[in-house]
C-alpha cells in the first residue's frame, strides 16, 4: 500500500503541475486512498465479491502515526472517510452490476477534478 500511495502522490503532483494547477495535501491523500482501493481491487479476479473485503482492510480500522499534528490527523481521517464513501458508491453503482469499464471511465473523470469537486461528487454519489 505504501508503494501505491507514493506512486499516486508523485503522479498526481506531476499531472497537476503539468496543468499548472496547485494541489492540497488533502487532495493528495484522498486520491491516494482511492488509488489504493482501485489498485488492490483490480488485482483480484472477482471485483464485486472482493470490494467489501478490500474496503474493510483499507478503511475500517486505519492506523495513524502517533506523532501527527491535529491538522495532519484530521486530513488523514477526512481522506479515509471520503475514500471509503466513494469506494462504497463505486461498488454499489458499478461493481455489483459487473460494470467495471464504466467505473474506470468515471475514475478517469474523478481523477481530473479538483478537491471541492471531488468531495461534491462523492457526496452526490453516496
Question: Positions of the model-derived regions?
Answer:
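Active-site recognition of the HExxH zinc-binding catalytic motif
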Residues: 1-14
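Pan-zinc metallopeptidase signature
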Residues: 67-126
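Extended alpha-helical scaffold/coiled-coil
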Residues: 46, 50-72, 86, 114
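Active-site nucleophile-His-acid catalytic modules used for acyl/amide transfer and hydrolysis
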Residues: 16-21
Amino acid at each position: 500500500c505504501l508503494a501505491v500511495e507514493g506512486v499516486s502522490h508523485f503522479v498526481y503532483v506531476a499531472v497537476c503541475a503539468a496543468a499548472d494547477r496547485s494541489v492540497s495535501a488533502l487532495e493528495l491523500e484522498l486520491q491516494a486512498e482511492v488509488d489504493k482501493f482501485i489498485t488492490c481491487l483490480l488485482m483480484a479476479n472477482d471485483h464485486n465479491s472482493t470490494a467489501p473485503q478490500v474496503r474493510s482492510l483499507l478503511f475500517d480500522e486505519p492506523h495513524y502515526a502517533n506523532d501527527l499534528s491535529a491538522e495532519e490527523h484530521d486530513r488523514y481521517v477526512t481522506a479515509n472517510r471520503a475514500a471509503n464513501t466513494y469506494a462504497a458508491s463505486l461498488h454499489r453503482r458499478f461493481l455489483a452490476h459487473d460494470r467495471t469499464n464504466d467505473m474506470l471511465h468515471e475514475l478517469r473523470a474523478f481523477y481530473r477534478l479538483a478537491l471541492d469537486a471531488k468531495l461534491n461528487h462523492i457526496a452526490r454519489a453516496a
